């Protein structure tokens, strides 16, 4: 129970910070998201070094900034162009420097996709209510998955035991259901006109992506 409370409290602290920067406006949100993306890149670099993979961090830092700026501008053509330019620049950098292996190149491409591409989409969401729902989903899915899994988890996911041995089917489903309930309550309490089906579909997709992201992070670590 203490472990659960610590985990929930840590999630609430992060959620509070995200709510604050989102409430302050788009520029503080962009700065906060950009800062988070650079921290994530740094953590990915540390994790991958443990398995002898070297990332071209200067290149990834530069392309991350380009993608974040393009996402902030929120023009689809500019955003797509930033992705194409970033990928081309990444592989040209790797080829010309000759300091990296093929495995390093694929790892760098994955990190660009997993960190820069995915995180930048927060800045591309035009309806701020979906940003709030994204935060609620991430926290709610993690918290309820842990709680339900700890209390009722009986069916271990054997196929991912080498990544996360404590994951259970009940926990995964509980995380999705818990996040969905929280988002429905949020939309109803704040008078948002999102229909139930839209809320459920959005939350299920976001919760599944959140859980996959958690598994990827666990695998790398």
What are these regions (language model features)?
Residues 1-204:
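Membrane-embedded alpha-helical bundles of polytopic integral membrane proteins
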Residues 141-150, 210-221:
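Short helical (or helix-break) motifs at transmembrane helix termini and adjacent helical loops
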């Amino acid at each position: 129970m203490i472990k659960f409370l610590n985990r929930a409290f840590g999630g609430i602290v992060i959620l509070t910070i995200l709510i604050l920067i989102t409430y302050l406006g788009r520029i503080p949100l962009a700065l906060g998201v950009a800062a988070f993306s650079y921290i994530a890149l740094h953590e990915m670099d540390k994790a991958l070094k443990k398995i002898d993979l070297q990332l071209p961090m200067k290149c990834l830092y530069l392309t991350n900034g380009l993608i974040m700026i393009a996402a902030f501008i929120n023009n689809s053509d500019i955003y797509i162009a930033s992705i194409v330019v970033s990928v081309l620049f990444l592989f040209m950098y790797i080829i010309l420097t000759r300091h990296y292996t093929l495995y390093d190149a694929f790892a760098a491409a994955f990190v660009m996709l997993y960190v820069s591409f995915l995180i930048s989409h927060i800045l591309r969401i035009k309806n701020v209510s979906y940003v709030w729902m994204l935060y609620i989903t991430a926290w709610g899915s993690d918290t309820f998955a842990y709680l339900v899994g700890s209390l009722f988890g009986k069916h271990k996911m054997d196929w991912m035991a080498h990544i996360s041995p404590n994951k259970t089917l009940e926990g995964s489903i509980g995380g999705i259901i818990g996040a969905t309930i929280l988002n429905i309550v949020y939309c109803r309490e704040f008078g948002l006109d999102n229909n139930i089906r839209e809320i459920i579909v959005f939350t299920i997709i976001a919760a599944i992506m959140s859980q996959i992201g958690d598994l990827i992070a666990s695998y790398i670590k």
